[in-house]
Structure formats: C-alpha cells, structure tokens
Amino acid sequence: MIAGEETDIVAVQAEFMALFGPILQVAYGTAVRLTRSRTEADDLVQDAALLAYKAFGTFERGTNFKAWFFRILTNAFYSRHRKEKHEKANLSSEEVPALYLYQKTAEAGLWGSESDPAAAIMDRLDADRVGEALDSLPEDYRVVSTLYFIDDLSYQQIADVLQCPIGTVRSRLHRGRRMLQKALWEVAMERGIN
C-alpha cells in the first residue's frame, strides 16, 4: 500500500468516526426500539455502521449525517425483518378516539393541575414503561414514533430516512400518537399508576 493511500484511509476513518461517534448512543437506542432486543440492536447498529462506512463516499459533506445514517439503519432493519415481519394487530388507530388519553386521565382523576394528560401519565411512568407502550405499536407506527419522539427528527428528516412522502410520515405519526395514548393508558393501568 502506498503511504498516500494509507493517509487517505486514516483521514476517511477519522472523519467517519467524528460524525458517527456522537450519534452512536442515539442510533443504538433507536435500534433497540426497532428490534425490541439489545442483542439484535447490537447487530443492527454494527451492520448499519459497516454499510454506512462502505457508502461514506456517497455522503454529501455539509448535509445531515444523522438523517443519512438513520436511513441506512432503518433500511437495514427492514431488510433484516422483511421475511419475519409480524405486526401486533391488537391496536388499531381507528378504534382509538382522538382524545383517548385526555378522557381516561380526566375520568381517573389523574390530570390534576397539569395541562397535558400525556405528561400526567408520563410523570408517573418510568422510561421502561413508556418504552413498553412504544414497543406495543405496529412496526410502521413504532418506527415513525421512535424517530420523531426519541430521536427528535423532523417530519422531513423522517421522510428522507424512510424514503416516503412527508404526508405518510404525518399520517403514521398521527395514528401512532392515538395508538400510543391507548397503550400508555393500558400500561399505566397494568402498573396501577394513579
């Protein structure tokens, strides 16, 4: 190997790690939410990182690396689970009223002085319980909700990551919110939160 080529490889590796390092924990958290397994999440992040490194030459410098990487991560997830895809059909957005959580928290007297009933429930649940509620969503809604609520991506970034129209993102997020309200309430009641 020529010394100049070796220097170039080291520079590319350093640049990749400078961009990838700060998002590693967030990517791992997303992978755990997508796969519902820490072991599978490890494999998914490793596969996505390898794919991203191999495709790093196609990354446009100055654009959003996090969104670019999350596109690779979600594509890797979908590729891995395409054959074994099994969605939980127990929650249907059509069955959940738009103000479900508002109604239930008011009925149970949990709302109190807080202006947001979701906050009233979330304050009484730890992160694991909120994660349980998020995990109960069907895959399409779970992915969009995770990217929006956990990873703080914008509608446009999520559309770019998932390679779908922004209207699809909005629709899935709207339905996902409704299903999440019901799931949060069910988790809260299972845990005897009051």
Q: What are the functions of these language-model segments?
A:
Residues 2-7, 15-16, 91, 160-161, ...:
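C-terminal edge and immediately downstream basic/flexible tail or linker adjoining helix-turn-helix-like DNA-binding
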Residues 19-38, 53-55, 134, 186:
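Amphipathic, Lys/Arg- and hydrophobic-enriched alpha-helical face
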Residues 43-50, 63-75:
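Structural recognition of an alpha-helix C-terminal capping motif at a helix-to-coil junction
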Residues 27, 31, 56, 69, ...:
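Hydrophobic-face residues of short alpha-helical interaction/recognition segments
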Residues 3-29, 39-42:
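A short, charge-rich alpha-helical start-of-domain segment used by transcription regulators
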Residues 144-148:
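A short pre-motif secondary-structure segment
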Residues 49-64, 83-85:
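Sigma70-family region 2
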Residues 60, 74-93, 99-105, 123, ...:
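Arg/Lys-rich amphipathic alpha helix in sigma70-family domain 2
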